[in-house]
Design a protein with these regions (language model features):
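Catalytic domains of carbohydrate-active enzymes that cleave complex glycans
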Residues: 169, 178-197
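Aromatic- and carboxylate-enriched substrate-binding clefts and catalytic-loop regions
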Residues: 2-171, 175
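Short, well-ordered loop/turn and helix-capping segments at boundaries between secondary-structure elements
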Residues: 87, 113-116, 185-187, 191, ...
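Glycan-recognition and catalytic regions of carbohydrate-active enzymes
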Residues: 193-217
């Protein structure tokens, strides 16, 4: 993956430390599909080849990131990516993306869209940010045009006054119940559990409840 538009990356090959066929095989044994995270610009450069190759390998979807604009060229890029992925039965989770404008209806393989000031902001935010208030406000605004991938589920929690942004050990403002409530309130067909596996192991009751919540009602 690359966020730098000028950096050339061959997305048809993984780094040597990642044995992708073995990961896909293990996922099938556990009945779990594999999703690849890709920058949209590097994906666009090898779009047809990447979709064909990874579809044949058994990849189920792409989490496409770093568009970060909504001009005409960017919109055309999104449509091209969505159309090509649909041809190869690959679903999309669009991050770094503008809010839905109907493209999710045109391309049903788009299962979720960020387009929101999501929980990742906890990595670099400050206690000047009132995240709990924001979290109960944007459903009445941002969710009007379509679903939202907020990536909730933070298990390390604190009050607003004690909150400190931390990239490597992020915490969230509010309570764990506040985080759990997002899975119920937010329209998010392909939702995330954004914290680390060890955090959920420590909060088994919360993790089990989150896993029991339907993606759609």
């Amino acid at each position: 993956n690359s966020k730098d538009d000028n950096e050339k990356v061959d997305i048809l090959h993984t780094i040597k430390e990642i044995n992708l066929p073995e990961i896909i095989k293990y996922g099938k044994e556990k009945k779990v599909g594999v999703v690849l995270w890709l920058g949209i610009n590097v994906l666009s450069e090898q779009l047809e080849e990447a979709c064909k190759q990874y579809s044949q390998m058994g990849i189920k979807g792409f989490k496409v990131d770093f568009l970060d604009r909504n001009d005409q060229t960017a919109v055309e890029q999104v449509y091209k990516v969505a159309e090509t992925c649909a041809k190869y039965n690959i679903f999309l989770d669009l991050h770094g993306m503008y809010a839905p404008t109907g493209y999710n209806r045109t391309f049903p393989n788009i299962l979720n869209v960020e387009g929101v000031w999501g929980l990742e902001q906890a990595k670099w935010g400050s206690n000047k940010d009132d995240m709990p208030t924001y979290c109960v406000t944007f459903p009445f605004l941002r969710m009007m045009p379509g679903y939202v991938d907020y990536t909730p589920g933070g298990m390390r929690n604190c009050t607003k006054d004690h909150f400190v942004g931390d990239y490597y050990w992020p915490q969230t403002q509010g309570t764990r119940c506040h985080q759990i409530g997002m899975y119920i309130v937010y329209d998010s067909p392909l939702t995330m559990m954004a914290d680390s596996p060890t955090a959920y192991e420590k909060e088994e009751e919360c993790a089990s409840f989150i896993a029991s919540i339907p993606n759609q009602y």
